[in-house]
């Protein structure tokens, strides 16, 4: 840039010097002409010699030749197509002047069409020629990056969104925690509702078991031979059944509650029936033991005590303390008849108590007889009855022995006013 300025300044000074010289030359010729005219006017009447000398003096002043103008030099520039045109000199003949425009320059002979190159600005590379390069950004003194609030707005929006997300998460956790105790209480309430059913069923089964034991005890007492009975019933080794025993095979005592399944306590369906079948098998296996018991001396002692008590009762009857004509007592119909009991349970036939076809001796007043110790048939029959009674008692002392590990029944003690009291 400095070189260009120096070049322009040199050209300008050269041009200025040339013009000054030309002006001086012109001014010198005018002065000489004026002087010559004055001389001619003032000395018109002089002689020819004097005029000749004056003319020679003037001609001698015009003798030096005029200088030719210096040729111009056109500077290099960028044309309208963006191409660089190198500088050139106008020194060919009369074409000594740089003419044209800033974008197109040439040499000419007319001085009036001369181009003032100092006014042109296409000496540098144009901005549009730098393709792919953004223009240099000028620093704006009014722009302060510290006062720009665009980034701050973005930060504020992101912070608000993050806070809303956190609030939603904590709200959800709080609601779940608030509803969780209610669900726990509901589950506990359901558990409490379902558990008493299991306990009630267990208590009810224990109560049914106690009732069954009591009823069996009463049935055993009813099935025993009375004191004045001459013909006794045949006892079976099987445990007498009762209507309550059929209900014990079901895990639920009530039909409506039996449909509800207990998720906490589930009982196997055939457990009670299997226990009852095993109990019957144990009862069937007691027959051999009863035969061995009858042959023992302890059984003889029991029979002797029995005969002594029978003799004492006969004496009381003779004295009139006991009624000689016993009244027949009608037995209440039982809810469950052993003769029509279940045919099979767990593949075993149930044994029932069969009543003898002939009527009892005490039912008829004509057949009533006092005690005769010499009657061998009565003694033999009483001995058989006592043996069978021992068998029945041994089979019915613990009818549900296998169930006592879960529900131990209490063995009641019945107090009577009879002297033939037997504790079971």
From Swiss-Prot:
Primary site of residence: membrane
Q: Where is the composition biased (Polar residues)?
A: 362-373, 402-424
Q: Which tissues is it found in, per the record?
A: Brain-specific. Mainly expressed in neurons, including in hippocampus, cerebral cortex, striatum, thalamus, olfactory bulb and cerebellum. Expressed in most brain structures during embryonic and postnatal development.
For membrane topology, the record states: Single-pass type I membrane protein
Phenotype upon knockout? Induces an increase in the paired-pulse ratio of AMPA currents in lateral and medial perforant path-granule cell synapses.
- Which residue intervals make up region (Disordered)? 333-373, 389-424
Q: How does it assemble?
A: Component of some AMPA receptors (ionotropic glutamate receptors) complex, at least composed of some AMPA receptor (GRIA1, GRIA2 and/or GRIA3), CACNG2 and SHISA9, as well as low level of DLG4.
Q: What is the name listed in the Swiss-Prot or TrEMBL entry for this protein?
A: Protein shisa-9
Q: Identify the species of origin.
A: Mus musculus
> What's the encoding gene here?
Shisa9
């Amino acid at each position: 840039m400095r070189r260009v300025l120096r070049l322009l300044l040199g050209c300008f000074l050269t041009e200025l010097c040339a013009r000054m010289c030309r002006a001086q030359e012109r001014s010198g010729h005018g002065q000489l002409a004026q002087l010559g005219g004055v001389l001619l006017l003032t000395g018109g009447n002089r002689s020819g010699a004097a005029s000749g000398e004056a003319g020679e003096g003037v001609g001698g002043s015009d003798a030096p030749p005029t200088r030719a103008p210096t040729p111009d030099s056109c500077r290099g520039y960028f044309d309208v197509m963006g191409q660089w045109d190198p500088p050139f000199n106008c020194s060919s003949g009369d074409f000594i002047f740089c003419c044209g425009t800033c974008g197109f320059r040439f040499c000419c002979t007319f001085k009036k069409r001369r181009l003032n190159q100092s006014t042109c600005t296409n000496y540098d590379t144009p901005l549009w020629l730098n393709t792919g390069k953004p223009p240099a950004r000028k620093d704006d003194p009014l722009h302060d990056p510290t006062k720009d609030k665009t980034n701050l707005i973005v930060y504020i929006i992101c912070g608000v969104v993050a806070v809303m997300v956190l609030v939603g998460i904590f709200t959800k956790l709080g609601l779940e925690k608030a509803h969780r105790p209610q669900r726990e209480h509901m589950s506990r309430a359901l558990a409490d509702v379902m558990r008493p059913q299991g306990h009630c069923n267990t208590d009810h089964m224990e109560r049914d078991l106690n009732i069954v034991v009591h009823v069996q005890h009463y049935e055993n007492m009813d099935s025993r031979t009375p004191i004045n009975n001459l013909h006794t019933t045949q006892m079976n080794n099987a445990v007498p059944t009762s209507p309550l025993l059929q209900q014990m095979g079901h895990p639920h005592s009530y039909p409506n509650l039996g449909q509800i399944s207990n998720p906490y306590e589930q009982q196997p369906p055939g457990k009670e029936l299997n226990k009852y079948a095993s109990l019957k098998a144990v009862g069937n296996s007691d027959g051999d033991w009863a035969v061995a018991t009858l042959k023992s001396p302890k059984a003889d002692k029991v029979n002797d005590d029995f005969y002594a008590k029978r003799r004492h009762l006969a004496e009381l009857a003779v004295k009139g303390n006991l009624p000689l004509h016993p009244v027949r007592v009608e037995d209440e119909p039982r809810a469950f008849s052993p003769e029509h009991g279940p045919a099979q349970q767990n593949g075993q036939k149930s044994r029932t108590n069969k009543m003898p076809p002939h009527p009892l001796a005490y039912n008829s007043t004509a057949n009533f007889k006092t005690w005769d110790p010499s009657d061998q048939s009565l003694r033999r029959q009483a001995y058989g009855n006592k043996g069978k009674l021992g068998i029945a008692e041994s089979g019915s002392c613990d009818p549900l022995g296998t169930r006592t590990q879960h529900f131990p029944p209490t063995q009641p003690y019945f107090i009577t006013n009879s002297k033939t009291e037997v504790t079971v």
